[in-house]
Amino acid sequence: FISPPSKGTSLTFKCKVGITVIWLLLGAVLGYLFLVIAFCLPTNRMRSHLESTPDVFYNGSVALVKDDLATHLDYLTEATILSEAIYDGNESPFVKAAAIYSVLPPEGDENWSYRKLISSLSATNESAHGPYDRYWQGQLAILRPLLLLLDYKDILRLNTLVQLFLMLWIAHLLSCHSLTHLLFPLALMFCSLTPIATGICLQYTPCFLIMAIGCVVLLRHTNIINKFNWLFFLSLGMATSYFDFLTYPLVTLGIPLILYLQLETSSPSQRFFQITTCSLSWGIGYIGFWAEKWLLGSVILQENLFSEAYNSIILRSSHETLGQTITYMATLKNNLQAYDLRTWKILWLLLFLVTIVLALHRHCLTLHNILAFSPLCLVACMPFVWYYFTQNHSYIHFGFTHRELSITFFALSCFLVQLCNSAHIE
């Protein structure tokens, strides 16, 4: 929580702790109320807008391009989200917002995702249902109102347009900051997220939008963020905990943090300090806001969600799955295979070669310059640390957890481009 004196404010440590606690509590109250309001909305129209949707899920999870992991669409979770959005049981909105119920599909020969959505569309008050109360699932506070106006296909098209618009806005803001040399790393990062998939899968949307909106806010209000960087990253962590379904959450820290470092003129040691404090703030927001959901759910539902959450954390961070031992290298292999394409290999080879040639030609390949931009290399390592502590989850769900590596792509490409763009320093 402590920022370097040159970039910080006059707020004391105790004051920052107090603001953090108030911010977390206020966020939890507002987040819960948004969900309560969303569950007060009528469901009939939402269901009618999803009547043509189940056929999309008939074959379950798919890859848009055969054998291309990066285009994988997790329709199992997608069907769960849609089923939760149209749940219409007898419980009060306050209970629904805490429990996040969905109808349990009956046994059958069809794919689980298809059965899940079909049974949800035809459900009655007596239909079997179950909660998914470990997560906030704040995406429902937006999805339910949208389903009153749009069908599933309309929402996906809107999502694609919003994501593209945000990336173009970031590119424009980089130009306004005279950071046009970062446009190539931005494009590289955008491609590594496989926007063709993130645009048409609601599950992949929250982290992308939080990351992109965070970058826009950072670039538009740089002076304010410099003064309150801890609060900015705390808010990003809270938003990620609220909206995300544990897909690739680290990008909401890593990508804005990389941009933040590009806007800084401080020394490498100060930048390492900023990486630590900003990451700590994000982590407190992410974990703290999640813990608030468990506390809130435990009180409202009269259940011990902390016990369930603890068991889930132990499972997701374990080195086993279905009795099989997982190695860290196996987890890395699963996630790296999404980028095991000739296109990426050639692109990175060319980038390294061009960097070396230009750096030598411009006489900027110096130890001083390398050390000046070395904090970016630390950020580039973040996904690998994340994979180590979430081996079970990252090994199983590599179809979307591989997107954490977009942080590495962005950080390394920024490092190389900055090295070429730097002036020679004796």
Regions found by a protein language model. Name each.
Residues 160-184:
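Transmembrane-helix motifs of polytopic, lipid-linked glycan transferases
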Residues 229-257, 274-288:
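Membrane-interface alpha helices of multi-pass inner-membrane proteins
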Residues 141-159:
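Juxtamembrane segments of multi-pass membrane glycosylation machinery
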Residues 275-355:
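Membrane-lumen/periplasm interface segments of specific transmembrane helices
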Residues 3-15, 219-229, 261-273, 360-367, ...:
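Membrane-interface junctions at the ends of membrane-embedded or membrane-associated helices
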Residues 141, 187-210, 237-240:
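Aromatic- and kink-enriched transmembrane "portal" helix at the membrane-lumen/periplasm boundary
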Residues 356-380:
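Membrane-interface helix-loop-helix junctions at transmembrane boundaries of multi-pass membrane enzymes
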